[in-house]
């Protein structure tokens, strides 16, 4: 599902995110936070997406990952198009409150290329 919020959507727009969470966030200049999706039971890093306050609110309240597409300028819910859902198990902020870690139960591929993870094809350094 892709959508804009009723107020036009996007970074810097009003959101229903709880003020006690929103006030702690350190966003980029464009109002976004990097959101790392990690498989909850194996620790496998799946992908990195971007969230604004509204995307984080939707993720926390629906139990499904919602991201902000910087290229399309709209929200997207992982799995609505591909069927490769991310069911949220936990959400945490890092120590600086500038990155979100979303532990998920990934159904199918996390990467738009069809692979399980976005980090498996261009390895720059690996143990010998």
UniProtKB/Swiss-Prot annotation:
Cellular location(s): Cytoplasm
Query: Amino-acid biosynthesis: present as a keyword of the record?
Result: yes
Q: Which cysteines link up through disulfide bonds?
A: none
EC number(s): the record gives 3.5.4.19
Cofactor(s) required for function per UniProt: Mg(2+); Zn(2+)
So, what pathway does this thing act in?
A: Amino-acid biosynthesis; L-histidine biosynthesis; L-histidine from 5-phospho-alpha-D-ribose 1-diphosphate: step 3/9
- Which protein is depicted? Phosphoribosyl-AMP cyclohydrolase
Give the species this sequence originates from.
Streptomyces coelicolor (strain ATCC BAA-471 / A3(2) / M145)
Which gene name belongs to this protein?
Answer: hisI
């Amino acid at each position: 599902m892709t959508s804009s919020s009723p107020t036009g959507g996007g970074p810097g727009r009003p959101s229903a995110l709880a003020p006690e969470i929103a006030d702690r966030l350190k966003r980029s200049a464009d109002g976004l936070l990097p959101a790392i999706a990690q498989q909850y039971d194996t620790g496998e890093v799946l992908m990195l997406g971007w969230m604004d306050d509204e995307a984080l609110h939707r993720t926390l309240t629906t139990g499904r990952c919602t991201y902000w597409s910087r290229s399309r300028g709209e929200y997207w819910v992982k799995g609505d198009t591909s069927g490769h859902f991310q069911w949220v198990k936990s959400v945490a902020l890092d120590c600086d409150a500038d990155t979100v870690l979303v532990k998920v139960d990934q159904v199918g591929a996390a990467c738009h290329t069809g692979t399980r993870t976005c980090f498996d094809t261009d390895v720059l350094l690996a143990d010998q």
